[in-house]
Curated annotation (Swiss-Prot):
Its main location: virion. This is Matrix protein VP40. Gene3D superfamilies: Matrix protein VP40, N-terminal domain (2.70.20.20). Keywords: Host cell membrane, Host endosome, Host membrane, Host-virus interaction, Inhibition of host innate immune response by virus, Inhibition of host interferon signaling pathway by virus, Inhibition of host JAK1 by virus, Interferon antiviral system evasion, Membrane, Viral budding, Viral budding via the host ESCRT complexes, Viral immunoevasion, Viral matrix protein, Viral release from host cell, Virion. The keyword Plastid does not apply. It holds the Pfam family Matrix_Filo. GO terms for biological process: symbiont-mediated suppression of host innate immune response; symbiont-mediated suppression of host JAK-STAT cascade via inhibition of JAK1 activity; symbiont-mediated suppression of host type I interferon-mediated signaling pathway; viral budding from plasma membrane; viral budding via host ESCRT complex. Most abundant protein in the virion. One of its GO terms (cellular component) is host cell endomembrane system. The lineage of its organism: Viruses, Riboviria, Orthornavirae, Negarnaviricota, Haploviricotina. GO terms for molecular function: structural constituent of virion. Belongs to the filoviridae matrix protein VP40 family. The keyword Membrane applies. Exists as a dimer until it reorganizes at the plasma membrane into multimeric form. Interacts with host TSG101. Interacts (via PPXY motif) with SMURF2 (via WW domains); the interaction positively regulates virus budding.
Length: 303
């Protein structure tokens, strides 16, 4: 369903409840969060630093944590996995080597808190933030996730104490057919149609719909949003083989323009959009998802 307000869901992503008390680049002192020592991540992935000189290369960044969960009046459950998506970024947005270095040299803690009855897991990076960085973890120094989205659901009913025992940074290079907005669109203030799959995950930014695709709609102001919402039933989600928590949408070539996208292979028949989601993300399409307008670069503020 298209949103006439355009910004509501996207603003939830820019300013979700867990960050309401903390401005950009304000890192919370570790002693206010946890008594545990910070832990430095290991690294896995298909990182080739030669890619840092290629502006149209995109990578997905994920922290994979192992935590011990201690419930009140219950024994500790050890070795619980947590999936913490940091986002997808191209070299147009920030140099790859600098991003990886900042993530790997940081020290992290993990805590739990409740906001308006909803339980969150907050990951805290100790050190100095990078104000203009596209990844929230590096920009603001902390990132929160709804608890039942990132750890097994059977740990979602009570209050727990977390102890971070292992942390791995996973960097996954997106395939060459990945669509991303072109450089001038990315660093500018142009908004794109997008599909919101979760209020605490970034909207999935889509290419601009071809003009003829929304001529059928009578309201020109809502044309792009209505055009996207009218074809959601045609979109199908596929799990990317051999990638962790990475999914893709192959868009109908006759409905979407790829001219503004960063396509390495210009001969592709249709744009392919990649996004991060939990491994159990449903693959039955995007019906009933909210359509919004979103900036490709989440460091921008909606006006």
């Amino acid at each position: 369903m298209a949103s006439s307000s355009n910004y509501n869901t996207y603003m939830q992503y820019l300013n979700p409840p867990p960050y309401a008390d903390h401005g950009a680049n304000q890192l919370i002192p570790a002693d206010q969060l946890s008594n545990q020592q910070g832990i430095t991540p290991n690294y896995v992935g298909d990182l080739n630093l030669d890619d840092q000189f290629k502006g149209n290369v995109c990578h997905a960044f994920t922290l994979e944590a192992i935590i011990d969960i201690s419930a009140y009046n219950e024994r500790t459950v050890k070795g619980v996995p947590a999936w913490l998506p940091l986002g997808i970024m191209s070299n147009f947005e920030y140099p790859l080597a600098h991003t990886v270095a900042a993530l790997l040299t940081g020290s992290y803690t993990i805590t739990q808190f409740t906001h308006n009855g909803q339980k969150f897991v907050r990951v805290n990076r100790l050190g100095t933030g990078i104000p203009a960085h596209p990844l929230r973890m590096l920009r603001e120094g902390n990132q929160a996730f709804i608890q039942n989205m990132v750890i097994p659901r059977n740990f979602s009913t009570n209050q727990f104490t977390y102890n971070l025992t292992n942390l791995v940074l996973s960097v996954q290079k997106l395939p060459d057919d990945a669509w991303r907005p072109s450089k001038d669109k990315l660093i500018g203030n142009t908004m794109h149609p997008a599909v919101s799959i979760h209020p605490n995950l970034p909207p999935i930014v889509l290419p601009t719909v071809k003009k003829q695709a929304y001529r059928q709609h009578k309201n020109p102001n809502n044309g792009p949003l209505l055009a996207i919402s009218g074809i959601l039933h045609q979109l199908r989600v596929e799990k990317v083989p051999e990638k962790t928590s990475l999914f893709r949408i192959s868009l109908p070539a006759d409905m979407f323009s790829v001219k503004e996208g960063m396509m390495k292979k210009r001969g592709e028949n249709s744009p392919v959009v990649y996004f991060q989601a939990p491994e159990n993300f449903p693959l039955n399409g995007f019906n009933n998802r909210q359509v919004v307008l979103a900036y490709a670069n989440p460091t921008l503020s909606a006006v």
